[in-house]
């Protein structure tokens, strides 16, 4: 144990190991944050949600930070409502139980592109008589554009670019250009815009609330996909999923392999022969093809795939490598001494044989994590990912299916790819440093 402690202290001598450990701790911190911020059930609900969950977001919107690298500033997405006080609302009582509701919101538009869409969600309260609303759009040069006049139900959505009354008044002009262009120059008019909602209620206790959604060309820190989903959900939750899959597969595989190799070496005979024959058969089995068949015909669950991955990875060439070392250790003097004082087979295997392999196990365990992380993403890209969990591989699969690279949605591919590279690089740097520390022959390389 003292040797292990001293070896771990040597990590400080390797800058690559320090960098790897730092990145791993950052990934772990992101994992903890994701699990706390977005609980498992909520993450699944969000990722499987449709228009009812993500309908207010723009489609195929790059991250907001894209504006820092572009000469043209694209409009940001935002949402305001009367419920949280971000939209101004006043109510004036009238005669015979009528009332007038004035709702407005002003914002400064200093962008070089048009929004994808603007929409208003109405939430009204009434018994029998529907409220009536008039929606107006006020431009920086003082023009007042009527969007629509209509009676609203208790829950109703108005999309500016799909409203028939508004479209008919444009005579074929694009709705967003009609709202944001200067009619004199036919270019975007920058300045302060205002959306006005004037509502009339016809019953005592009747009320109108509204939400205004401005769907810009960029959104959030990670952007959105074809279903308007915020990719940050999958990027955050993909971190604990990737680390859990990689670490569990690595630990389960290498530890089990070492134990089986130790048992076969110690008992020898038919037990050792059986283990070697199973290993040789497993070495010629099509590993990826079996995983694809399991995912296709049995289950897409990531935990089922994890179990099969561990089973297929146990009887590999590592068993023969461990066996060669255990054969030498088995003939050591301290093993003979343990036999002499009557130590049991289990005690010798788990307290004398296996501990001698730990210095070789640790670097291999750390270095093998990226391979299993990439395996999970590979299966997801092949369409065999977990159907409910948001993962990095699922993001790449969706991007590939929707032709992200051909359509210029590079962020959709790059974000999960960079996270996969960081994960692989962090464990690789730490693993190589540990290999040098625990293997003296590599220290001068």
Q: What are the roles of these predicted feature ranges?
A:
Residues 1-246, 253, 399-422, 429-430, ...:
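Gly/Trp-centered helix-boundary motif
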Residues 224-445:
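Alpha-helical transmembrane segments of integral membrane proteins
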């Amino acid at each position: 144990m003292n040797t292990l402690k001293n070896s771990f202290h040597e990590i400080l001598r390797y800058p690559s190991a320090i960098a790897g450990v730092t990145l791993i701790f950052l990934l772990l911190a992101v994992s903890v944050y994701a699990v706390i911020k977005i609980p498992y059930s909520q993450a699944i609900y969000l990722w499987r949600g449709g228009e009812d969950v993500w309908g207010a977001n723009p489609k195929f919107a790059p991250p907001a930070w894209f504006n820092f690298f572009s000469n043209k500033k694209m409009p940001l997405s935002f949402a305001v409502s009367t419920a949280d006080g971000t939209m101004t609302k006043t109510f004036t009582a009238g005669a015979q139980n009528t009332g007038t509701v004035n709702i407005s919101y002003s914002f400064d538009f200093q962008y070089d592109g048009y929004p994808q869409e603007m929409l208003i969600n109405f939430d009204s309260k009434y018994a029998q008589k529907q409220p009536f609303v008039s929606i107006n759009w006020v431009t920086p040069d003082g023009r007042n554009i009527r969007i629509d006049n209509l009676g609203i139900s208790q829950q109703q959505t108005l999309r500016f670019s799909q409203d028939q009354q508004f479209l008919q008044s444009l005579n074929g002009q694009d709705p967003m250009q009609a709202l944001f262009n200067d009619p004199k120059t036919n270019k975007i008019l920058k300045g302060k815009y205002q959306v006005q909602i004037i509502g009339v209620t016809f019953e005592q206790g009747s009320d109108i609330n509204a939400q205004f959604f401005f769907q810009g060309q960029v959104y959030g820190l990670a952007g959105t996909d074809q279903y308007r989903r915020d990719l940050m959900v999958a990027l955050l939750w993909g971190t604990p999923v990737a680390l859990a899959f990689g670490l569990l597969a690595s630990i389960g595989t290498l530890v089990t392999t070492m134990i089986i190799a130790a048992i076969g070496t110690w008992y020898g005979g038919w037990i050792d022969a059986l283990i070697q024959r199973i290993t040789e058969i497993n070495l010629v089995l099509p590993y990826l093809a079996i995983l694809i068949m399991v995912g296709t015909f049995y289950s897409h669950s990531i935990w089922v795939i994890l179990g099969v991955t561990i089973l297929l990875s146990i009887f590999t060439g590592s068993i023969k490598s461990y066996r060669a070392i255990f054969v030498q250790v088995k003939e050591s003097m301290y093993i003979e001494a343990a036999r002499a004082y009557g130590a049991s087979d289990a005690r010798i295997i788990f307290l004398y044989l296996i501990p001698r392999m730990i210095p070789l196990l640790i670097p291999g365990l750390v270095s093998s994590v990226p391979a299993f992380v990439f395996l999970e993403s590979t299966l997801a890209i092949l369409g065999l990912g977990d159907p409910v969990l948001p993962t990095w591989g699922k993001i790449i699969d969706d991007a590939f299916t929707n032709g992200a690279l051909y359509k210029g949605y590079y962020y959709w591919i790059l974000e999960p790819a960079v996270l996969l590279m960081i994960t692989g690089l962090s464990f690789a740097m730490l693993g190589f440093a540990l290999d040098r520390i625990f293997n003296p022959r590599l220290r001068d390389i």
